[in-house]
């Protein structure tokens, strides 16, 4: 299960995720995120309460990054990663694709 909190302010989209971003929750998250991409000039995603991410979740993040890049916007920023998820980002090369803090 994934809980998503979103806040848009002056084109800056902030998203807080709680739970698991997996094969079951990724399509719903993508559907929530997609319409906001047109308005956003920056995206920050807070992983503080995210316990797990699958390859399907990584794909959603990659699509968001590509959409932002295509319109010349800022790189997607991911904050508060736990050690396990940071390791997944390192192994998959996502640490070079997204901005991690």
Where are these regions (language model features)?
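Amphipathic alpha-helical interaction surfaces in cytosolic regulatory modules
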Residues: 23-97
């Amino acid at each position: 299960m994934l809980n998503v909190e979103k806040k848009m302010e002056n084109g800056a989209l902030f998203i807080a995720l709680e739970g698991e971003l997996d094969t079951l929750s990724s399509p719903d998250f993508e559907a929530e995120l997609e319409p906001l991409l047109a308005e956003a000039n920056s995206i920050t995603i807070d992983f503080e309460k995210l316990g797990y991410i699958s390859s399907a979740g990584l794909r959603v993040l990659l699509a968001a990054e590509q959409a932002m890049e295509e319109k010349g916007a800022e790189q997607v920023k991911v904050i508060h990663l736990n050690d396990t998820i940071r390791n997944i980002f390192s192994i998959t090369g996502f640490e070079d694709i997204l901005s991690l803090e």
